[in-house]
Amino acid sequence: MTIVLGRVPKEENDLFDTMDDWLRRDRFVFVGWSGLLLFPCAYFALGGWFTGTTFVTSWYTHGLASSYLEGCNFLTAAVSTPANSLAHSLLLLWGPEAQGDFTRWCQLGGLWTFVALHGAFALIGFMLRQFELARSVQLRPYNAISFSGPIAVFVSVFLIYPLGQSGWFFAPSFGVAAIFRFILFFQGFHNWTLNPFHMMGVAGVLGAALLCAIHGATVENTLFEDGDGANTFRAFNPTQAEETYSMVTANRFWSQIFGVAFSNKRWLHFFMLFVPVTGLWMSAIGVVGLALNLRAYDFVSQEIRAAEDPEFETFYTKNILLNEGIRAWMAAQDQPHENLIFPEEVLPRGNAL
């Protein structure tokens, strides 16, 4: 019998393996394949927003001052949407509108589409980052799935809604006061607060806040006593087998308070995940409906009776009148190019609506 000893030739890593090794290397800030999408898009979205709020006016698109350079502050500065006449143009810097002129591109509202599209892809990249890291450390992907809620809301409000309307003009501008104005617009033109999907969204978000507060307080209240006084951060070993807090005590407490309580940690934490994510998704679905101009609840019988009987009025009919006032003032202000003229008798008159 002959035994031959020799070296097995080592195959050289191809480009993919080399990139995979570098991208997924254990470092202080994980990069990963998702980072190729996340980091550039987040950088450009934030950079575009800071640039716009610092230097760029909205005079040419909305007739407004919207930058620190013009005297706005953090609450009133914004990167505003393009003009209504530009419809759904992507407003590329090299496109037919700006023709490579950066100043003209900013004046036309090009920074808004730049921030919106890069922001959407940055959020998707962050979700993929959570998937990638979860797979690397062998976790379930619920963090990434939960983050689909904020992504759905962003995409529906900033992209799908204006796509259903006549242009990007009707999307929210990126600023605090600008978002508030958009909320008022949603109420006046869509009666958003009476939309069942908005109601489910509010229930989900506020319900999640309540659950979070209750859960945090309950865990704090039932932490097992340790030998380090009030400081529990050094007393428990991360690899300990026993519980850090008493689920049995917590269950007994809430059973006495409400009559019912969670007896299973998995169901409890899944419920805390389910409530806010479902609320955000319901809100997103509702905004998609508004993009198609679907109406909220209409209680026509109350409106007819209120019109016929001056002594009959409900909170609903009062809100409908307020919505009419919002529309009458907002439409003429926001869309001067439409030359909307309302007779004096239909315009709100101060407090005398």
Swiss-Prot record:
A plastoquinone binds at residues 215, 262. It catalyses: 2 a plastoquinone + 4 hnu + 2 H2O = 2 a plastoquinol + O2. It is found in: Plastid, Chloroplast thylakoid membrane. The modification Phosphothreonine is found at residue 2. One of its GO terms (molecular function) is iron ion binding. Coiled coil: none annotated. Its main location: plastid. Fe cation binds at residues 215, 269. Pheophytin a binds at residues 130, 143. Keywords: Acetylation, Chlorophyll, Chloroplast, Chromophore, Electron transport, Iron, Magnesium, Membrane, Metal-binding, Oxidoreductase, Phosphoprotein, Photosynthesis, Photosystem II, Plastid, Thylakoid, Transmembrane, Transmembrane helix, Transport. It is a multi-pass membrane protein. One of its GO terms (biological process) is photosynthetic electron transport in photosystem II. The D1/D2 heterodimer binds P680, chlorophylls that are the primary electron donor of PSII, and subsequent electron acceptors. It shares a non-heme iron and each subunit binds pheophytin, quinone, additional chlorophylls, carotenoids and lipids. There is also a Cl(-1) ion associated with D1 and D2, which is required for oxygen evolution. The PSII complex binds additional chlorophylls, carotenoids and specific lipids. The modification N-acetylthreonine is found at residue 2. Chlorophyll a PD2 binds at residue 198. InterPro entries: D1/D2 (IPR055266), Photo_II_D1/D2_sf (IPR036854), Photo_RC_L/M (IPR000484), Photo_RC_L/M_CS (IPR055265), PSII_PsbD/D2 (IPR005868). PSII is composed of 1 copy each of membrane proteins PsbA, PsbB, PsbC, PsbD, PsbE, PsbF, PsbH, PsbI, PsbJ, PsbK, PsbL, PsbM, PsbT, PsbX, PsbY, PsbZ, Psb30/Ycf12, at least 3 peripheral proteins of the oxygen-evolving complex and a large number of cofactors. It forms dimeric complexes. Belongs to the reaction center PufL/M/PsbA/D family. 2 of the reaction center chlorophylls (ChlD1 and ChlD2) are entirely coordinated by water. This is Photosystem II D2 protein. It comes from Lolium perenne (Perennial ryegrass).
